[in-house]
Amino acid sequence: MNRSFKGFVLLAALLTFAPQALPEDRSGNHDGLPPRINVRVHNYAQVSTEILAQAEAEAAGILGKAGIEVSWTNCDPTQKDLGDADECNQFLGPTNMAVRILPFLGAIPGTDKKTMGFALGNLASVSIRRVNEEAAEFGVQPYEVLGPAIAHELGHLLLGRKGHSPTGIMRAHWRREDYERAPRGAFNFTAEQARSVRAEVGRRVKEQGTAEVTTATVTK
């Protein structure tokens, strides 16, 4: 599986997340709490509620060990548009990201049949077909692959092209032993990556706050 950051891939896909309203500020670091990112999950693959909840818990645990809190919003693409007030129609921005769970990725330049996902801008995508194939290959549950895959792609959104490492969650390819050692931290960020992720989210929180203050000043 090549989980490499595909910065040039599917730019048009971002158009499906055109901004509809100003983002809700839920990313501040108050009272010593860890910095938070808001992640919308667009479940195009219709993954079951149970598996998705387990996967989100896995991903949140991985990011939590790096010092980042995640607030999830699950968006059902089959539901009718609820308008600008709906969180699923909020801006993507510095601390407001989205993950698409897709049935499959299709033909994407620069990828191969083992590619599980890609990340671009503030949008990450994961193939449930590849998740299920890897789960079957290594004898684990789908959520045990989907959760780390989501965390991996969010890691790319925060770390960029320098994201891959020879160990941990940002490995380009996972092996059977990685899943076997997952309870002992095989899917954690490295210490250096954890510091970089915290610094990047902290920077984004400040950027988000500055943008909102500027917007409020202009609209007075």
Identify the residue ranges that each predicted region occupies.
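Residue-level signature of transmembrane alpha-helix interfaces in integral membrane proteins
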Residues: A18, G83, G168-I169
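N-terminal secretory signal peptides that target proteins for export/translocation
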Residues: M1-F5
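Bacterial N-terminal signal peptides
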Residues: G7-Q20
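Metzincin-family zinc-dependent endopeptidase catalytic domain
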Residues: T49-L157, G163
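Short amphipathic alpha-helical "recognition" segments used for binding
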Residues: G7-L10, L157, A216
